[in-house]
Amino acid sequence: MNFKTALICFALLLIGTLCSAYSNQERQRDSRRVAEIMRTSLDDNTKIHRIQELLTIYNRMAPSLRPDERARIDRFISRHTEGIMVDGVPSQGGARKIFKKTLSPAAKSVATGFFTELGASLASLFTSWFPATTTERNH
């Protein structure tokens, strides 16, 4: 009986891992989305509003990154999101949430710099996964 239980648990673990894997198709879709976000985010408010979408894409891709890549980006995100103030008060609801309220000019500058650097980091990772020749053939 123990063998059957262990086998069932192992099968469920294996199936769960395979179903939740970050597929090549999802990577390509996210790669195109990051490129679109970076290309179409021209003003500060748009950049600030799209930070959460970049963080969502990063959270999807993070488990498939090398440990050093993940640690580098996690440190960058933590360094910039923990200190973001909204109306002079630290943001609530988690370290990785950016509220869509009016920010002071200094905070807006920090947030847009964060957007630019995070977007560039994600784009760089996608470029390393999909060299230009592969990406160009898929378009």
Curated annotation (Swiss-Prot):
- The UniProt record lists the keyword Signal: yes
Keywords assigned by UniProt?
Answer: Immunity, Innate immunity, Secreted, Signal
Coiled-coil residue windows: none
Q: Where is the signal peptide?
A: 1-21
Q: Name one GO cellular component term.
A: extracellular space
Q: Which GO terms describe its biological process?
A: cellular response to heat; cellular response to UV; innate immune response; response to bacterium; response to heat; response to UV
Spell out the subcellular localization from the entry.
Secreted
| Task of the protein | A humoral factor that may play a role in stress tolerance.
Similarity comment: Belongs to the Turandot family.
Q: What is this protein called?
A: Protein Turandot B
Q: From which source organism is this entry?
A: Drosophila simulans (Fruit fly)
